Amino acid sequence: MYTTVVYQVKSKDVKAAAHAIAIGQSIGNPTIRNGYENNDHAAEISYVHNDEVVIKYKNKNLNRPTDVAQLLCTIQGGHTDIDIIDECRIRDIFVDIPEYKKIWHHPTDRPLVGGIIKPKSGITVSQLTEIVERMCAGGIDWIKSDEILSDPSYLTLSVRAEAVAKVLDKYRNVMYCMCVNGDPVHFLRQRKHAEDHGLGIHTNFWSGLGIYENPSVYQHFQRSGIRILTDERNPFSISWKVITTLAIMQGVDSIHAGMIGGYYPGDEQEVFDSLYLCRDHNRIATLSCGMNPETAKSIKDRIGNNWLAAVGGWLHEGDITENVRKMRKAVES
């Protein structure tokens, strides 16, 4: 079994660079060999043409194929520091996607409406519960904390989770995702708090791209800041399509795919690539950044029903309940 990676490589000798990647990222130093190396574990170069290099990595070198942290260390690791490689972008990846079991059974006859809690920090428990109540009263489907609001010392995640869960006792089919950003031990503790209260989670990639393997809790992948990894101006970048694939492989339930229209500065094609991957694997693609009823209606006309409109700032201008109703009307029309 293999994981196949498609690279875009800039080098004075692309074939030599391909050899350096394949050998250096599997069994040993590409130029200094020893008698202990086992070629049965070596990565295989399957294609080199112009700047495109395709390499097949053997999954037996990983603990498991979904071990994303070690996989990334393998496919975009030490070769980025050698002089023969000027640029090396991962454009695509081909992996086996495990069977997926949906946790949240949501409406499918229209785009979903999601709300993002504001303010990002400084919120009180009473403000939080009032905002959640108002969103739910308007007919919200999905709510998430902002990625800035994880487990601040002034108002811990455990306190907020308990308060939110009490409100949602009246709205059993609303999915609420607590932000559980944190270092590994802290992340696990926060995820347990959310799970114990019947809530979902969302995590920014800084907490680790390989932390999502937990089928017992709803998990949302938040992309904020991801262009540090995906921007093509980074000579050793990883495409957003690849990141989306790795998130799906781990079993995430929804992915912040990006934005169509609004103030998004990147190429819409990468958003569509992520959207189509989510649809192919029965995951929810969320679109945000400047979302409002007019934008949502325009997007629905372009791509149909299978996505979630995550609304931030606009939802909090005026009456939250009424604004949710306006969003519902826009996606139902």
Language-model features: locations:
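N-terminal capping/small domains of soluble enzymes
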Residues: M1-C136
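Active-site mouth loops of central-metabolism enzymes
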Residues: V6-K12, P111-T129, M175-H186, L229-S239, ...
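Structural preference for beta-strand elements that scaffold enzyme active sites
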Residues: E52-V54, L112-G114, D141-K144, N173-C177, ...
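Active-site-adjacent beta->alpha loops and helix N-cap segments on the catalytic face
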Residues: I97-H106, L149-L168, D183-L188, F205-R223, ...
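Catalytic cores of alpha/beta
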Residues: V125-V132, G182-D196, S237-Q250, G290-N306
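Glycine-rich phosphate-binding active-site loops on the catalytic face of alpha/beta enzymes
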Residues: G138-D151, D196-I211, D253-Y264, C289-N292, ...
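Conserved anion-binding
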Residues: G198-Q269
